[in-house]
Amino acid sequence: MSFVPVNPRPFLQDLVNSFVTIRLKWGETEYVGRLVSIDSYMNIQLSDTKEYINRKFTGALGQVLIRCNNVLYIKKADEAETSGDVKMEE
């Protein structure tokens, strides 16, 4: 199995106007919101943003700007995350 490096810019440009989940490097913080824009430094602007800490909803934030060096990963949000439904843990 070999590793093939991929340029993240086309992936991120395809996600503009889609709901994404962004995990921060620090702690267990995640943001779910609509990706509005991404600049050449990969700073990220989200709208309709919701904050989750330890997978628990902590509040709606609205417009958010996330500096590039704080991001651990970005993924397309699934239906449960965008609808506001939160999975209950036992």
From Swiss-Prot:
Its main location: nucleus. GO terms for cellular component: catalytic step 2 spliceosome; pICln-Sm protein complex; post-mRNA release spliceosomal complex; Prp19 complex; U1 snRNP; U2 snRNP; U4 snRNP; U4/U6 x U5 tri-snRNP complex. Residues 7-80 form the Sm domain. The keyword Nucleus applies. Gene3D superfamilies: 2.30.30.100. It is found in: Nucleus; Cytoplasm. The keyword Transmembrane helix does not apply. InterPro entries: Lsm6/sSmF, LSM_dom_sf, Sm, Sm_dom_euk/arc, Sm_F. GO terms for molecular function: poly(U) RNA binding; RNA binding; splicing factor binding. Keywords: Cytoplasm, mRNA processing, mRNA splicing, Nucleus, Ribonucleoprotein, RNA-binding, Spliceosome. GO terms for biological process: 7-methylguanosine cap hypermethylation; mRNA splicing, via spliceosome. Belongs to the snRNP Sm proteins family. SmF/LSm6 subfamily. Plays a role in pre-mRNA splicing as a core component of the spliceosomal U1, U2, U4 and U5 small nuclear ribonucleoproteins (snRNPs), the building blocks of the spliceosome. This is Probable small nuclear ribonucleoprotein F. It comes from Neurospora crassa (strain ATCC 24698 / 74-OR23-1A / CBS 708.71 / DSM 1257 / FGSC 987). The lineage of its organism: Eukaryota, Fungi, Dikarya, Ascomycota, Pezizomycotina.
